[in-house]
Amino acid sequence: MKRSGKIFTTAMLAVTLMMPAMGVSANEGNAAAEGNEKFRVLVDSVDQKNLKNAKQQYGVHWDFAGEGFTTDMNEKQFNALKKNKNLTVEKVPELEIATATDKPEALYNAMAASQSTPWGIKAIYNNSSITQTSGGGGINIAVLDTGVNTNHPDLRNNVEQCKDFTVGTTYTNNSCTDRQGHGTHVAGSALADGGTGNGVYGVAPDADLWAYKVLGDDGSGYADDIAAAIRHAGDQATALNTKVVINMSLGSSGESSLITNAVNYSYNKGVLIIAAAGNSGPYQGSIGYPGALVNAVAVAALENKVENGTYRVADFSSRGYSWTDGDYAIQKGDVEISAPGAAIYSTWFDGGYATISGTSMASPHAAGLAAKIWAQYPSASNVDVRGELQYRAYENDILSGYYAGYGDDFASGFGFATVQ
């Protein structure tokens, strides 16, 4: 489930009159490197004196200690710095939105608009008549995304942290404005509480929201900002002695060492990390990072269509590798579980609601379920909760969609993890 060098947000809009679909592909540095336009670089050295001098000369965006520091510079500065044999320097992946699809999903759209309870909530609760959800109390869901509308009536009661990591050096507290929509939508699927009673419910409405803005208002961002937020969530879990589920509805076609090391750091601190599998299906070996990492749970997207007695894995949902079928073991590049991700109705940045498709939408359903499970078993570890997700998925096999089949398959993973 590997792809080659791009970072993207993994949502697709179900209707064309909303914002462009989330699919962020990495700029290899071509356009950003022209003229005096600045871009992000990672600088490191075994010689601390040289590293200190470079920090003083260029300034620091984020300091990753043993991994070096990041800063912004133009092409001329970058080329000059590369000639310094005492330093190693590389470009940090830049993210930019790319439309995943502009094909209207009229049938899904009509279904979503006609239901007060999103189909994904009914599906994950395995209850077609449910109108209100519950659970997740005492658990924090850190949504690393474009920010969140913390004044949305369905979300404002859940907000505990609101931080902007795109400014660098340190985060900006009480600043996580979402002008794009993606992050607000993701947060809603995870933990919306229905607001005044006329809104939507997420999977775990009693959970607390940590809204971490790591992507800009256009849906673009840098790997170092994401890595800094991941590490901060891990540090907060330790400092506050609390349980944290990170949701990352974003991804990369190539692995970033900064993000990989940050994921490992926070996972080892007891944080459970959920990530979108990506929207490059149905092709084999297309799982994006960080979902492809062993210490992250990659979530595939299901659509509201039943075949062979189960929901169907969406064609757009990224697939793993056929040779991992049936092993019930998580390896790099595996899809782990599945959740609703096609035509998902949820909260929007303007205070209203929108319908979007993508593995970006599947991931927060799984994150909400993880929070709900953890609240039920507060003494459990992140590894325990992950095992419970796998077990529940195993109990609810997915048999529909390209490459889906009995047991652990490379389309749906272990299956569809549900509340009951």
Curated annotation (Swiss-Prot):
Maturation propeptide residues: 32-111
UniProt-annotated location(s): Secreted
Cofactor dependency: Ca(2+)
Cofactor detail note: Binds 1 Ca(2+) ion per subunit.
GO molecular function: metal ion binding; serine-type endopeptidase activity
Coiled coil (residue ranges): none
Catalytic activity: Hydrolysis of proteins with broad specificity for peptide bonds, and a preference for a large uncharged residue in P1. Hydrolyzes peptide amides
Gene Ontology cellular component annotations, sorted alphabetically: extracellular region
Temperature dependence: Still active at temperatures close to 0 degrees Celsius. Thermolabile.
Domain of life assignment: Bacteria
Gene3D superfamilies the UniProt entry points to: Peptidase S8/S53 domain
Main localisation: secreted
GO biological process, one term: proteolysis
EC code(s) of this entry: 3.4.21.62
Active site: 145, 182, 360
Record family assignment: Belongs to the peptidase S8 family.
Cited function: Subtilisin is an extracellular alkaline serine protease, it catalyzes the hydrolysis of proteins and peptide amides.
Additional comment: Secretion of subtilisin is associated with onset of sporulation, and many mutations which block sporulation at early stages affect expression levels of subtilisin. However, subtilisin is not necessary for normal sporulation.
Protein name from the UniProt record: Subtilisin
Organism name: Bacillus sp. (strain TA39)
